[in-house]
Amino acid sequence: MGHKPLNEQVIVITGASSGIGLATARMAARRGARVVLAARSEDVLADIAAEFGTRATYVVADVGRREDVQAIADHAVATFGGFDTWVNVAGLTVYGPLRKIALEDHERLIQTNLWGTVYGSLIAAEHLRGRGGAIVNVGSIASDLAFPFQGLYATSKHAVKGFTDTLRMELIAEGAPVSVTLVKPASIDTPLPNRARNYMDREPTLPPPIYPPKEVANAILHAAIHPQRDIFVGGGGKLFVMGKEFAPGAYDELASAIIAQQKRTEPPRNPKGALHAPQGAGRERGDPPIYVMRSSAYTRATLHPLATAGLAAGLAATAALVLGGKRARRRP
């Protein structure tokens, strides 16, 4: 199964006002695609769409509401005559121990991360059955790993993986010309921690190694053209998953270290975050206190399998960083 070149596609992107979604929208537009941007922040969406001129349109939507997601699809059809790729990026997180997090915060996270993906995927599949195309869901290495102090985030991403795999199998059984890809990023330098609901006594951050959002955007757009079942973004994340599969009990014993790696030294800046109301959108990147990798040689090699030498080098470099506990500060 193959898909149209990117410069002939219309691509719907949820969560397009910040982070991975924004990076994907910009990269897609630069490569000639027309884009339909969806998020909760209207003023930010309007500014982003203005960057791309007639190649972009936007819809203010909360993906936790099915009627809003249907409105995204309807707007894409009305504006561009349909769409070829649907990318579910919208997602939130909550930091803190499970026992201390309010039930309404748990529910809101699941509504966005899981149900937003379910609504988007099913609506997209209905449209694409007749014309072919791609559904790309953004999971996480938390689709394969538990994360203490991000328990419901990991729960939601495990569920996204199960749903995505099932949808793929059902579309294959139908003979539908629709590819379904799960992209699983490691830690990515986005504003996600800054916009999180935070119950901790410190400002949240991400465990190393951290990768730039352009790596995820590139993987997503690769899947829009070249169907691929799963894509890990970040060799460090792949190593963690492999380690957990090899020694799950040993991974459990890392709980205290994993919790510590999610805390900065300063007190919380904005503990309510953007869980229940949009705020802090408009930026691709966050402000992690440690070095951010320039790229992921591992991921680029998996997208281009002939680059085996690059894959080996990337894994070796990432292993050295993870095992050595390198803590160099981010370069300006």
What residues fall within each predicted segment?
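Conserved glycine-rich cofactor-binding loop
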Residues: V10, S17-G19
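Conserved glycine-rich Rossmann-like NAD(P)H-binding loop of the short-chain dehydrogenase/reductase
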Residues: R31-D47
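The beta1-alpha1 cofactor-binding region of Rossmann-like NAD(H)/NADP(H)-dependent oxidoreductases
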Residues: A61-A71, L103
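Substrate-binding pocket helix/loop in short-chain dehydrogenase/reductase
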Residues: P97-L98, D105-E107
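Active-site helix of classical SDR
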Residues: S121, S156
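Residue(s) in the substrate-gating loop at a strand-loop-helix junction
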Residues: S140
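SDR active-site lid
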Residues: A173-P267
